């Protein structure tokens, strides 16, 4: 049984560990699908089939979007376009799996992007991605290298769409 984004379990186990699915089932936790964090896996039907089969009996599903070399706030329009392409592939994979919650990274790189640029460009990017996303989708913008939480709060306020929330990764915050 799939839960809605608002009623999902509060504790989720990351699929990065081979034991994660079993732990999520045993302790009735949510489960984060990480197989598609590596963007080329979005194009591999064998990976998709294996992931789909592994979800039996799991609830509170999240899908972690790819993040390496995907920069929504990129200065180069081709880099930004590739990020949009990969995130659209992620939305499609989530829909195929019946997952309504996706963790995304914003691509902030200190000393490359001014925080003001990052916020401005991120607002435009997430609004564009959400413009053709399903109504029952929740994107969670996760902290990675941002200078502090206020940057992400400004993005969420600027996007002004209930389908964009924030995700605190305590490992990235330290």
Kindly give the residue locations of the regions a language model identified.
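N-terminal pre-domain/capping segments
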Residues: 1-89
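Short linear motifs at secondary-structure transitions and domain/linker junctions
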Residues: 5-10, 35-39, 115-116, 130, ...
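Structural preference for beta-strand elements that scaffold enzyme active sites
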Residues: 8-12, 28-32, 60-62, 99-103, ...
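Active-site-proximal loop/turn and secondary-structure-junction residues that shape catalytic pockets
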Residues: 15-17, 35-37, 67-69, 106-110, ...
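Active-site acidic/histidine proton-transfer and metal-coordination neighborhood
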Residues: 73-165
